[in-house]
Amino acid sequence: MSNITDPQMWDFDDLNFTGMPPTDEGYSPCRLETETLNKYVVIITYALVFLLSLLGNSLVMLVILYSRVGRSVTDVYLLNLALADLLFALTLPIWAASKVNGWIFGTFLCKVVSLLKEVNFYSGILLLACISVDRYLAIVHATRTLTQKRHLVKFVCLGCWGLSMNLSLPFFLFRQAYHPNNSSPVCYEVLGNDTAKWRMVLRILPHTFGFIVPLFVMLFCYGFTLRTLFKAHMGQKHRAMRVIFAVVLIFLLCWLPYNLVLLADTLMRTQVIQESCERRNNIGRALDATEILGFLHSCLNPIIYAFIGQNFRHGFLKILAMHGLVSKEFLARHRVTSYTSSSVNVSSNL
């Protein structure tokens, strides 16, 4: 077995959990010149994201589940988005601990948390693509038959979860806890003699069907949706779309940088661009930083709903009023002030 496929020969100090083994037969290990990121800053960041995500997404799910009468198709999608973020947030303490002592949690947790990370990403973009199609049909084609049949939305969401699981399944099957000599233990893919080739397949196929295709679907649908709104001068409907546009924008700002860096790393590993120690180090640092940005996404949607989503604020206050935590007079005043700007709620979202 050559040094490119034998885990004993890899320099794991240079590789993060998303890195790849070197592909060059004449490869010699590269050493990082400086620590990529202060691990304690990363740990504190993960802890804050965990707490905010746990609290925020739980509140989002609570508000949507309480509002059974006025629950829309978009609300069902956003409920599933919150569930995906909440499940991923539960893994953040494990990711944080691994930054200190390496991967000490064994193979099973290695598989599970890797699976949840990928499922969170893919389900997020697939659900957002479904929302874009729903808004496109409702606004551009004025189609209400599909959007009003909520039982169909449940099957669409199940399809998104199923596809996300399939796209993420290789991480569950092939990731293992491994403790190389003279290095901290890692959670890593072990694919046998053809590790480099199969890792290319495991990158290209999921990101094509789980990122690029849904991204183009969103760009197409929202492009025509915005065109229709501006052309028809639908000011109220445009304002009602603000939450959805904000959610999509935040998702792209958080996950697009990581995927672009991952693409650069893939091009380097396949020798499309020249590989060097300096380039490996730069890409490694960028992967670390952009992965944290992606993790941060799991706590941001509830913040968007709180600041932009009038229905979410009213639903939350309604729950508080039901339990005597705010007065019904205050709730009534809030309802009156928010009615004028949300009376035409084309997205029926938070």
UniProtKB/Swiss-Prot annotation:
Claim: Magnesium is one of the keywords in the record: no
One cellular component (GO) term of this entry: external side of plasma membrane
Gene Ontology molecular function terms on file: C-C chemokine binding; C-C chemokine receptor activity; C-X-C chemokine receptor activity; interleukin-8 binding
Membrane topology: Multi-pass membrane protein
S-S bridge residues: C110-C187
Source organism superkingdom: Eukaryota
Alphabetical keyword list: Cell membrane, Chemotaxis, Disulfide bond, G-protein coupled receptor, Glycoprotein, Membrane, Receptor, Transducer, Transmembrane, Transmembrane helix
Main localization of the protein described in the UniProt heading: membrane
Segments on the Extracellular side according to the record's topology features: 1-39, 97-111, 175-199, 265-285
Compartments (UniProt record): Cell membrane
Glycosylation sites: N3, N16
Pfam families (alphabetical): 7tm_1
Positions in the Cytoplasmic compartment: 67-75, 134-154, 221-242, 309-350
GO biological process, one term: neutrophil chemotaxis
Assembly and interaction partners: Interacts with IL8. Interacts with GNAI2.
Protein family membership: Belongs to the G-protein coupled receptor 1 family.
Protein name, entry field: C-X-C chemokine receptor type 1
Lineage of origin: Eukaryota, Metazoa, Chordata, Craniata, Vertebrata
Gene name of the encoded protein: CXCR1
